[in-house]
């Protein structure tokens, strides 16, 4: 009898994690949508001066519409949706470290399997058998996402914003080609664990094309004018900024390394990156005080923030490239302007191609 009880106990333990892992379904965009999505990495390059820990490639902002439902928790508890980063950490590359920037924080395989709370809460489908009055009578309001039995959420649709990146573990040889062509960087799942069942309805996001990374024997250096790297609009009154925009110029000078070891040709793409709220198809940054900022090229066309575009071509004999930009400050129609000092941070980022 004791052996039979022992066997029964082992079976229960084996099935408990499976129940937890299968608590949620998540799809791309809508119920029953795709559960496999991919981002193809365009061929890019590792600069010759890269050091371990350097981020050598980064994607544009990726905005993933996620739909989740099917909380089957038998204890009637609600459950949060988690973005599991690096869900299958056993698959790695010797030289390249993959990762995700989620809500401004970097998560990579050096951290192991990481779970990120999306703050999207889904109520148990089992609680639907009770009326709001019965839920209140049992004191189960704390089991519900909203705390209100009349406001139950059996599903959630939200937008997950992230960036994919590649870091250097150690500098690869000049002719190295990665064998890691397809890698799952994030899976949307429940709190318990990653559901590894290949038939599971849990949205996975892959990156592909890692075999197209090449290693350069060259790099570039940057200098920004003004040297303080601060665009100062000075003092102005509210009436002035209501009437017209204010502009300041700055420039970025890029110099290709000039030595006997530098033999490769390459291109550089760039992005103006911000964590602030964007409007106008991501071409204007809200400063938070009733003003907005745009960055314009030499033809007065606005740049799209958080998106890479070709910046300089060093495949020819060109060694130095300089470009001038305009920072344009303006008011937001119909929005009060707060007087006082303000600042915002915009990063200039590059990828080698």
From Swiss-Prot:
The keyword Signal applies. It comes from the Bacteria. GO terms for biological process: cell adhesion. The keyword Signal applies. One of its GO terms (cellular component) is pilus. Keywords: Signal. Residues 1-23 form the signal peptide. InterPro entries: Adhesion_dom_fimbrial_sf (IPR036937), Adhesion_dom_sf (IPR008966). May be involved in a fimbrial system chaperoned by YbgP and exported by YbgQ. To E.coli YqiI. This is Uncharacterized protein YbgO. It comes from Escherichia coli (strain K12).
